[in-house]
């Protein structure tokens, strides 16, 4: 690096192929800023510690980095050290000498060889976020007190985490947490894997009047929560995996007449033994500003939710099977109606009892998600919904008697096989419906009525096994209604055989996809009239016999994929009728799968690929032995060429590749018969070559053993063979 000796800033972030730095990095004595974030770096050379001018060292997301250099203490001008997202096991000794540090994202407490927690004492200017990890290595409360967190007034986020091994739930660990009391200026606090049976008094002290966010995670042995209702600024509270907690009582709210005055989001998750939520009975709403309440995997929680949540907008309840169960114990009152007048979004899942369905009458409710309900046959009437998602309701038979609300804009139905799709007259009422998704549902549906929804833009039907046709309703306005449709996707409908006669009257359709429709023999007629179509994706249609032979492909197509359409082999002589060469907007073409070998050969031999192509992907053509050069040579705008899983491919046309003057990327994968790259070399424009699982090419090029062959690719800036970067 002799020419870089005056360098002050060096950024190498996001290059995951960088696994080490040269020792000569130490020669950059003027370097102030070094960013190695999200690289594959495994170790830093010791010479990094001679960069005495270094002020910023960023190592965030270096997942392979397990240690820092031993002499880090020498970087006395370092102000910002970010090691978040690394695997560092302990900090080097004497980190306390880095007194200029303003940002230290993590501090991993060492055992006998690394830094003790006392090294934090001298780092009095730390601000921002600090995570102290492996607190199980702290000797006792006296040791913890040495960290002097109380006086670190610039810290606004603090994480205190013990190791992942079995937690120590003795009095010692409570003493450690007690002495780690932070400054009152703290805004966010996270405690993870704490092993004590109770929390120290400072946690929940009303003097912490700036804390806005708190996370208590994996504190398995605590049997009660601190009085968090006293934290007047608290806006978000997340509590997870407190397996010894059985009752959440008035102590949670603390002393104030109106607890949780600022709380807006409350989440409980994976509380395996939690059975009862007892409110304080303070007289007014206990969560006056709560907007979002989330309960997940609390299988024993019985009774009712807090009944008065006047500001609640979003409620998610998952895996709480006995909550609101009217068959719960007689001592629990579940009859009180819920006052959730501002509720806009409701998500209930995994067998939550139907008592919660009373919330469907809430006037402002606009988004509803019901999943894994096993004892519901008919949906109750719903008033003003905009979005409805039904998933995995095996007993659901019908929609509400009055139909769905006319305000509905999005309807998604997944795995509701017994559900009867809406009758024609009810479908016609959904005048605002914009998106409709049907997956593995409505087994009784044989035909889908196109043109019934005047504003539908997206229709996605998958795995509807008995669907036979898409038909155009014979009503005035049906064709006009289809003018809004932009996206049509049909997948996994094995009995689909026909479309409306004369084709799809969808002038604004931009995406059209068909896959895994075994009986389908042809695409819709007059597909060339779809002048707005940009993407056409055809996959796994084994009986498809023809494509666009009555006028060619849509003229403005940009992306075209055809894979695994075996019967098209017999039609390869009419490939010219597709009019591919006339598609001046086509940028991406993907072809692959059984039977498409002949199609590709025809396209190349007749030079039918348009010159506008930017991306060409050839895959899974088992009998393809070579690429006909003349069919490639004219693709002067091609930027990326990908060839994969072509077992019989033996050589590439070198002369033709030389004509690809815009080619930047070449990917070759799983082509075992390919032994050499062209002797003529690669085009000068090529900047990236990736060879993956090609045994012949690996032997020839991986170790640069054959200089005559290596010379043909040595000009390429980046060559990657499997997962190893060669140059």
Regions found by a protein language model. Name each.
Residues 143-148:
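A substrate-engagement module of RecA-like helicase motors
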Residues 1-113, 121-139, 150-170, 181-198, ...:
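Predominantly recognizes leucine-rich repeat
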């Amino acid at each position: 690096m002799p020419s870089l000796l005056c360098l002050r800033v060096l950024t190498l972030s996001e290059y995951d192929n960088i696994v080490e730095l040269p020792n000569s990095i130490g020669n950059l004595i003027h370097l102030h800023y070094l960013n190695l974030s999200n690289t594959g770096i495994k170790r830093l050379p010791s010479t990094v510690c001679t960069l005495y001018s270094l002020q910023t060292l960023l190592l965030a997301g270096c997942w392979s980095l397990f240690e820092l250099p031993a002499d880090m203490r020498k970087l006395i001008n370092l102000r910002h050290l970010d090691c978040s997202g690394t695997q560092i096991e302990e900090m080097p000794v004497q980190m306390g000498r880095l007194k200029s540090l303003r940002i230290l994202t993590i501090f991993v407490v060492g055992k006998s060889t690394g830094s003790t927690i006392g090294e934090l004492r001298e780092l009095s200017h730390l601000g921002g976020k600090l995570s102290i990890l492996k607190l199980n290595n702290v000797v006792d409360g006296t040791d913890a007190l040495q960290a002097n967190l109380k006086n670190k007034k610039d810290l606004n986020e603090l994480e205190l985490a013990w190791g992942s091994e079995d937690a120590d739930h003795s009095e010692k660990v409570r003493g450690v947490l007690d002495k780690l009391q932070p400054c009152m200026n703290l805004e966010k606090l996270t405690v993870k894997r704490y092993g004590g049976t109770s929390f120290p008094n400072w946690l929940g002290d009303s003097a912490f009047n700036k804390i806005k966010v708190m996370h208590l995670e994996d504190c398995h042995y605590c049997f009660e929560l601190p009085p968090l209702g006293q934290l007047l600024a608290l806006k978000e509270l997340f509590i997870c995996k407190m397996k010894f907690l059985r009752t959440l009582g008035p102590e949670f709210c603390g002393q104030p007449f109106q607890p949780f005055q600022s709380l807006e989001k409350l989440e409980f998750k994976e509380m395996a033994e939690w059975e009862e939520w007892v409110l304080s009975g303070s007289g007014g709403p206990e969560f006056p500003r709560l907007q979002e309440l989330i309960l997940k995997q609390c299988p024993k929680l019985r009774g009712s939710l807090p009944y008065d949540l006047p500001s609640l907008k979003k409620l998610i309840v998952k895996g709480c099977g006995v909550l609101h169960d009217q068959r719960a114990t007689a001592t629990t009152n579940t009859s009180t109606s819920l006052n959730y007048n501002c509720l806009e979004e409701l998500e209930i899942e995994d067998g939550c009892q139907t008592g919660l369905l009373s919330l469907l009458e809430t006037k402002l409710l606009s988004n509803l998600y019901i999943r894994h309900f096993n004892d519901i046959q008919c949906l109750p009437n719903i008033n003003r919904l905009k979005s409805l998602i039904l998933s995995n309701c095996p007993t659901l038979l019908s929609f509400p008697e009055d139909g769905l609300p006319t305000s509905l804009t999005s309807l998604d139905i997944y795995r509701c096989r017994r559900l009867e799709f809406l009758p024609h007259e009810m479908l016609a009422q959904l005048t605002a419906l914009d998106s409709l998704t049907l997956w593995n549902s409505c087994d009784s549906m044989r035909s889908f009525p196109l043109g019934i929804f005047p504003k539908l833009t997206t229709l996605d039907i998958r795995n509807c096994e008995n669907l036979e046709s898409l038909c155009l309703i014979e009503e005035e306005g049906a064709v006009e209604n289809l003018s809004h449709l932009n996206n049509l996707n049909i997948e996994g409908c094995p009995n689909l055989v026909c479309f409306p006669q004369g084709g799809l009257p969808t002038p604004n359709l931009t995406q059209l996809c068909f896959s895994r429709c075994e009986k389908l023999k042809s695409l819709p007629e007059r597909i060339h009239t779809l002048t707005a179509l940009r993407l056409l994706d055809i996959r796994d249609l084994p009986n498809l016999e023809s494509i666009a032979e009555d006028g060619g492909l849509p003229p403005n197509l940009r992306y075209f994929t055809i894979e695994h359409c075996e019967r098209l082999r017999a039609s390869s002589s009419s490939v010219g009728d597709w009019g591919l060469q006339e598609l001046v907007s086509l940028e991406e073409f993907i072809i692959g799968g059984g039977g498409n070998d002949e199609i590709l050969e025809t396209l190349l031999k007749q030079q039918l690929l348009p010159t506008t192509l930017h991306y060409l992907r050839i895959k899974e053509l088992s009998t393809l032995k070579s690429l006909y050069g003349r069919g490639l040579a004219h693709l002067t705008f091609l930027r990326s060429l990908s060839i994969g899983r072509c077992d019989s491919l033996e050589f590439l046309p070198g002369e033709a590749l030389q004509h690809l003057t815009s080619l930047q990327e070449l990917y070759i994968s799983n082509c075992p018969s390919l032994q050499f790259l062209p002797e003529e070399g690669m085009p000068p424009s090529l900047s990236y070559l990736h060879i993956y699982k090609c045994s012949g090419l690996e032997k020839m090029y991986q170790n640069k053993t054959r200089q005559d062959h290596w010379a043909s690719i040595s000009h390429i800036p980046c060559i990657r063979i499997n997962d190893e970067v060669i140059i």
